[in-house]
Amino acid sequence: MISLDDELAGEYLAECCEHMATVETGLLAMENGGAEIAEEEVNRVFRAMHSVKEGAGFFDLAKIRELAHQAEDVLALIRSHDLVPTPDRVRVLLRASDRLRELIQDSTHSNQADIAEILEALAMAPADRTSPL
């Protein structure tokens, strides 16, 4: 693991803030657009979440990686049109985004964070693909 004091880690964390802004903007667009959301917007959100996940793995930020991975899985289903971004599902993704921001802001202690509740909510998102949560 590279120290979070490391310059490279600082750059990663700064990029995470940018990625999370992209995620939030895109999720809000999804909430408003639902199934009519532009494919490029979904791809942009997916890529931003993927970048957060991959960097977290590099820096051994296990909880950030785990949460980003679970959110990315839901986004992948939306991206492949296997899941409709209903308002309830998007709200779960927004909650995950908010929690990720908190973990990124306190990255030094993020591996001790309790993320079970939001992981469970994300796991339930695709449970019924034909109707809202």
PLM region descriptions:
Residues M1-L133:
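Non-catalytic helical tethers at domain boundaries
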